[in-house]
């Protein structure tokens, strides 16, 4: 069934357009329309930065809003969308523990024994505060914005339209440079001293005491990818600037071994459709990855692949797409897709979903035949009506598909 026919049926059932409050997807094929762009732009103006300075900026609404704006800026090059992305990044950076005033919840002592440049992952009442390699995700979000600015030199000397409330830099380039500087600062002062085990090929490990979270264990893969995302995007920014080649080399020497480590942990399998798939652990040495956390593995694979730098080919990522499309989506239990990458379902994070988590939409790049099925899952569960990242990713993938067809 064509995507336009799908939407005709859906619209007939609802007697209304597919709306995420103010957001609209008019069809799943053709170019992204100005109506779709305007609706997204209007909607995000009503979505304020979330309260707090913790994981809400990792995998919560704050971090996801940044990524969504970036994708829609790639589609539209609409400066108002970039400005909203900058707004979220500014709010996030301003709330970093060492920058945020104590009376607002900052200046917390972290498990390492002092105030650290992190966004604490523990609740505000936990002492000492927790933080780990997931800090990479905030850096990745912020430097996605920096990358988009650096890719558009016509913006560099223009004043940022929304102003500079936190003195991060009044022009677009100055703002990008500040984001890069602060990202490198967190890597230098938090990540490198604690989480890179040089004696084991620069792999990501949690330290021992006084850290109590997974002490001396490998980082779970979803968290590992969050850190890899940060390093990849910082490398991309430094390449665009053609600066700090020593740092690029040092980051590459961390990124590639950790990607290789992940790839070496994969266990090949075959789906009921006969496609090559993989299973892997949530964290080494054993176990089975759940589909909540595997979403971040998928996002990380895409970010590294898109950079074109880390020996990941199109064919390397097809089995991950097969795993999600043929095993996870192909196994329905009590109305939900499988909760683990082997097709089984458990509870909690392994309980499964009746929708497609937004990060998995990247995998439609490698299984274009499944894009409409993914979109139908979002539509039928009402996710398009409420999810900024899902709507943005669907429109972004729609745009890529249209441009590929137009280029043929």
Regions found by a protein language model. Give the residues of each.
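Cleavable N-terminal signal peptides
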Residues: 7-8, 18
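Terminal, non-catalytic domain-edge segments
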Residues: 21-53, 142-186, 233, 237, ...
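N-terminal substrate-binding region of glycoside hydrolase catalytic domains
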Residues: 23-82, 89, 93-100
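Solvent-exposed loop and edge beta-strand segments that line ligand/cofactor-binding
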Residues: 43-63, 70, 74, 117-136, ...
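Long, repeat-rich segments with strong aromatic
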Residues: 248-332
């Amino acid at each position: 069934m064509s995507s336009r026919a799908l939407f005709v049926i859906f619209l007939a059932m609802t007697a209304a357009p597919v709306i995420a409050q103010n957001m609209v997807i008019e069809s799943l094929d053709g170019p992204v329309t100005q109506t779709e762009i305007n609706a997204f732009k209007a909607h995000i103006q009503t979505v304020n930065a979330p309260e707090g300075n913790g994981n809400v900026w990792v995998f919560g609404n704050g971090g996801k809003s940044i990524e969504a704006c970036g994708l829609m800026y790639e589609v539209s090059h609409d400066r108002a969308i970039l400005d909203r992305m900058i707004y979220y990044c500014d709010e996030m950076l301003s709330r970093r523990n060492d920058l945020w005033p104590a009376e607002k919840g900052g200046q917390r002592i972290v498990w390492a024994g002092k105030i650290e440049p992190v966004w604490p992952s523990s609740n505000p009442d936990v002492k000492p505060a927790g933080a780990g390699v997931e800090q990479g995700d905030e850096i990745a979000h912020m430097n996605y914005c920096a990358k988009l600015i650096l890719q558009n030199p016509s913006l560099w000397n223009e004043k940022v339209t929304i102003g500079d409330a936190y003195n991060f830099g009044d022009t677009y380039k100055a703002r990008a440079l500040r984001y890069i500087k602060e990202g490198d600062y967190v890597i230098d002062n938090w990540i490198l001293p604690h989480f890179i085990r040089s004696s084991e090929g620069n792999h990501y490990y949690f330290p021992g005491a006084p850290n109590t979270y997974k002490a001396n264990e490998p980082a779970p893969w979803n968290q590992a990818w969050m850190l890899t995302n940060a390093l990849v995007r910082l490398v991309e920014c430094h390449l665009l600037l053609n600066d700090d080649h020593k740092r690029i080399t040092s980051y590459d020497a961390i990124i590639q071994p950790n990607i290789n480590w992940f790839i070496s942990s994969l266990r090949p399998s075959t789906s009921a459709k006969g496609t090559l798939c993989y299973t892997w652990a949530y964290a080494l040495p054993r176990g089975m990855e759940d589909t909540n956390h595997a979403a971040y593995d998928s996002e990380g694979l895409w970010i590294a692949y898109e950079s074109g730098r880390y020996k990941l080919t199109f064919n390397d990522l097809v089995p991950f797409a097969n795993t999600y499309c043929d095993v996870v989506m192909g196994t329905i239990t009590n109305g939900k897709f499988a909760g683990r990458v082997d097709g089984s379902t458990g509870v909690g994070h392994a309980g499964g979903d009746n929708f497609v988590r937004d990060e998995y939409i990247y995998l439609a790049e490698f299984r274009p035949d499944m894009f409409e099925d993914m979109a139908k899952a979002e539509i039928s569960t009402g996710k398009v009506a409420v999810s900024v990242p899902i709507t943005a990713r669907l429109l972004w993938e729609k745009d890529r598909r249209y441009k590929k067809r137009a280029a043929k």
